[in-house]
Amino acid sequence: AVDAYDDDDNLKNEEGDYYNESDDGYSGDEEEEEKQEEDEQDDDDLQFDDGVPEDPISTLKCFSFNSVGTGSPCIFGVPVPAIRQVHS
């Protein structure tokens, strides 16, 4: 029986020719470069605005602590009037 592996971790195919398991016929560097180019193109196409302005002080100008949690709730887009608990 012929051993399929030799000392160099090369494999024998059915014809008895040696080939390296990691050698698939092309350089992996080319694939990585193509992948990086695709990623860069995707980044250019998709620009998300995270809503955070560059100036953090301008954010505080629009924020009022008095208005937090005081708005009336809405159900299915219809405003619901505030209900006050009646003390007996």
UniProtKB/Swiss-Prot annotation:
Location of region: Disordered: 1-54
Acidic residues composition bias: residue spans: 16-53
Protein name (database record): Uncharacterized protein RJ39
Tissue note: Predominantly in developing fruit.
Highest taxon of source: Eukaryota
